[in-house]
Amino acid sequence: VLQQQDAAKIVANDGLGNPTLDTNQRQIKVLLRQGAGYRLVAENRSWLPSAGDVDMPCLADPLLDEGSIEINRGVLKVSLSYWLSCGSWGVSRDTYTFRWQQNRLRLIGWDGVEFMRNSGDMTERSINYLTGRQKTVTGGNMFEDVPAAKIKTRWQTLPPQPARYLDGPSLPSPQDWESVGANADCSQFHLYKNKESNT
């Protein structure tokens, strides 16, 4: 992950939240070993969110605060977390899974968990883009064990989706889950600025 270093994009914040907001753009690049060096196989310059957001100054860095990027056996996972120090009890974590196939990193799955910090009420969702199926689990609690009888699992078939890749033409952000269709019931995901970057 690369990040622009422009001092003008580190903005002072006089209100609630972080005292300074780093709005420098990030990009993600993926390189594979080739001979004695490496070759660039994918990149995206606008998908990853910046560390700070002037519209949500209480938002912690989505990538560095419990977020992560890992790659193993041709599978890349990018996790983004959403935690606000003010204005919301909600917390969410979104993990995007890409697989190296046909010389591109294809988005094959998405997993999301969201919970309330005050009650612990939790919802988990998972989408398999290869099968077009979504799993939704409700009734769980982040802070305590819940009897299995109270956990509800629902499976749904989503409308056909075009293949999406790390290097474009476009990647979904949480806003897009609502447009997947009313059956998807994904309207509660937290919003963030969709920025493209390539690995």
Model-derived segments and spans:
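Hydrophobic beta-strand segments that make up the repeating blades of beta-propeller
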Residues: 1-5, 76-78
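Generic low-polarity alpha-helical segments
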Residues: 2, 30-32, 171
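Intrinsically disordered, low-complexity segments enriched in polar/charged residues with Gly/Pro
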Residues: 16-18, 55, 83-86
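Acidic, small-residue rich beta-repeat scaffolds with periodic aromatic anchors
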Residues: 60-199
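Blade-edge motifs of beta-propeller repeat domains
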Residues: 36-59
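Short glycine/acidic-enriched loop and turn motifs that connect beta-strands
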Residues: 5-9, 84-86
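Beta-propeller blade repeat segments, especially FG-GAP/WD-type strand-to-loop junctions
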Residues: 9-43, 98-100
